[in-house]
Amino acid sequence: MLKLTPRQAEILAFIKRCLEDNGYPPTRAEIAQELGFKSPNAAEEHLKALARKGAIEMTPGASRGIRIPGFEAKPDDSSLPIIGRVAAGAPILAEQHIEESCNINPAFFHPRADYLLRVHGMSMKDIGIFDGDLLAVHTTREARNGQVVVARIGDEVTVKRFKREGSKVWLIAENPEFAPIEVNLKDQDLVIEGLSVGVIRR
């Protein structure tokens, strides 16, 4: 890693603190506020300089897409990050950013929850998943028929009940007003992002 300026070292230290304290990196806006920059754009320029020097790695288009090579945050057993927005109706493009954290032990859920997803829509209301709820999600790529999954179709994410027969998958709503989403695995991409392991209402 190339030598950092004092300002760059300060930003890197703040990123490490966020990773240690929260388990996830800060946004550009949070960096700007902490370091007294006038706008997130100024923070972005410093982050690009840190990336060029090999101090961090950046994921384009992600508000918290900052990684420090070789740095592993200590697992936090007292909270879970609230990530993005997931449609519980017609799928929408999910915003993959962490809104805040929720003070709850991941081990409260079984299997252990990895994050919370904020639900928008009423397509799963008949099993008690309502608009605004936080869905506890266990990360896995595998799902069995009948399980409630977080599924990604292309760049869109939705919460539905999973059913598969051969190369066809149905993502089924728990609300008669919503038709099932049919996916042919031969010509459509479908990724299981995780399983629902609980719901939090605040």
From Swiss-Prot:
One of its GO terms (molecular function) is serine-type endopeptidase activity. The keyword Methyltransferase does not apply. It comes from the Bacteria. Signal peptide: none annotated. CDD domains: S24_LexA-like. Keywords: Autocatalytic cleavage, DNA damage, DNA repair, DNA replication, DNA-binding, Hydrolase, Repressor, SOS response, Transcription, Transcription regulation. The keyword Plastid does not apply. The active site is at S123 (for autocatalytic cleavage activity), K160 (for autocatalytic cleavage activity). InterPro entries: LexA, LexA-like, LexA/Signal_pep-like_sf, LexA_DNA-bd_dom, LexA_repressor, Peptidase_S24_LexA, Peptidase_S24_S26A/B/C, WH-like_DNA-bd_sf. Gene3D superfamilies: Umud Fragment, subunit A, Winged helix-like DNA-binding domain superfamily/Winged helix DNA-binding domain. Residues 28-48 bind DNA. It is an enzyme of class 3 (hydrolase). GO terms for biological process: DNA repair; DNA replication; negative regulation of DNA-templated transcription; proteolysis; SOS response. The record marks A88, G89 as: Cleavage. Pfam families: LexA_DNA_bind, Peptidase_S24. Homodimer. Belongs to the peptidase S24 family. Represses a number of genes involved in the response to DNA damage (SOS response), including recA and lexA. In the presence of single-stranded DNA, RecA interacts with LexA causing an autocatalytic cleavage which disrupts the DNA-binding part of LexA, leading to derepression of the SOS regulon and eventually DNA repair. This is LexA repressor.
